[in-house]
Amino acid sequence: MDFLSILPPQRHCTSELCDNDESVQAIISALEYTGLAKILTETFSADEFVEALDARLLYIAHIILSCKETNVPINTDTFLCPLAERIKVDVDDLNAGSLKCMKVLLHHCTNRYFIKIVEKMTRGQSSNLLWFLVRNELVTGSSVVKQCSYKPGLNSVAHGIFRPASRFEVFGKVHEPIVRDVIATFVERRPIPVSETLGLLIDPFSGTFGASIDLCYGIEEHDDGFVTVGERAHVYEIKCMARYIYSAADVEGFLDNPTLKGFASLIKGATFPLIEHRLPGATPSSGAHIVSHDRMFETNRKRKSIYESNDYVRRLLNINRGVKSTVYIFREKPQPDERDKLTLECLAKFTANIFLNARHKYFDQTSMQYFVVTQHYINDHPDPECIEPDTLPRVSVVTALFKTRNIGTHHSLEVNHKTYPNSAIPFALIVTPVAFDAEILSVFLRETFDNYAQQVYNKSKIRLWDPNFLRGFVASHRELEKTP
């Protein structure tokens, strides 16, 4: 079965609200007419210095007020009621002209509370219209490229929402929930902390950087619906490899006797192997997201031997070269006492020298996730100055490989008590921990912030600033001094 051909076409935003084109188009038109620069220009004087977090909250307030005024069916009161309480006005009196009233909130550390509200309101990510709107003009993993460089979004908000999703994106959206449940069942062996996909996480100190997380353990959802990041949180970035869907016949022999050597042979059999082999000290290409020095993954294909890389990339490659990934191998089997359902069993688990390629765009994405989640951990910690480096968040990339179903098998797949009809079958997960360098990441983030602030100034003549947003991040990576 060709799963890519039978998946129904989708728009990039799968929210049912997008079917109400008149309402959605109204809010999109309002945002594209104004934008962050125009909001700042109308609120502040030329050359005035504005903290980046304050600027972000003004823009988010504008977005949510625009949703209210254009009757987009979003519960805007979740954000507007606490906002009205803070600036001492009636929530029904809040409108686009109220933004200047928000100047009384400038420089308030309690403004970080609104960042938590945004996360709660944007759960579901691409199935949530507000996630697209609030994400606009944020620095995210998709707007950074090639380490220490930044490019603003070139496409309009409307393009991001209404563009057709590629068949690979659709495959990922359909199968990512399955992988989350596989991780919960076989890797973490505990329930998923937040039932819905986490919403947009915005850096609570700068308000400039954002990240969307596929799955995170070590967070806690409280009675008010807000989440806090605890010690040793573990972020899983899921990659469903739609380009590598194996037929059931191709993997049957391997699943009968799963070994690391057999897995390597399966990987090498692809026209463009998923895992790129490189000798120690050699620089990988930017095409494959995972690399190995193990000769088990070596192919006879000729590869370019020299690739350009800067000192930062070489340092990142060096600290990741020794990383060991864990490979899980699965096979479907009939669900006991339920003949019309399939479940998964773990056939084997082994470790291998497979690490994330610092030249690949996924490294930029995971770096942003690591930074933003760490900032939330610092913000949520009762005593940030006492944070130990070994309590900081971790990030792993989960590469999921799928196979077609056996001929004649049409039963639903059940994983973690959830049912998935007509899906491909996950038969391998490669869980790859990622190592980061706080010094390199801090340099990149500072350069990115300055670049972003300059672009905002060019459009608005307002100077965004935040000289200290990296202070806690840098300090948290230093070992605490031992007291006698």
UniProtKB/Swiss-Prot annotation:
Cellular component terms (Gene Ontology): host cell cytoplasm; host cell nucleus
UniProt KW Hydrolase keyword: yes
Pfam families assigned: Viral_alk_exo
Top EC class for this record: hydrolase
A GO MF term: endonuclease activity
Keywords tagged on the record: Endonuclease, Exonuclease, Host cytoplasm, Host nucleus, Host-virus interaction, Hydrolase, Nuclease
Presence of the UniProt keyword Nuclease in the record: yes
InterPro entries for this protein: Herpes_alk_exo, PDDEXK-like_dom_sf, Restrct_endonuc-II-like, Viral_alk_exo
Localization annotation: Host nucleus; Host cytoplasm
Site entry (Required for function), positions: E176, D214, E237, K239
Source domain of life: Viruses
Entry's EC annotation: 3.1.-.-
Assembly: Interacts with major DNA-binding protein; this interaction increases the nuclease processivity of the alkaline exonuclease.
Membership in a protein family: Belongs to the herpesviridae alkaline nuclease family.
Role of this protein: Plays a role in processing non linear or branched viral DNA intermediates in order to promote the production of mature packaged unit-length linear progeny viral DNA molecules. Exhibits endonuclease and exonuclease activities and accepts both double-stranded and single-stranded DNA as substrate. Exonuclease digestion of DNA is in the 5'-> 3' direction and the products are 5'-monophosphate nucleosides. Additionally, forms a recombinase with the major DNA-binding protein, which displays strand exchange activity.
Protein name: Alkaline nuclease
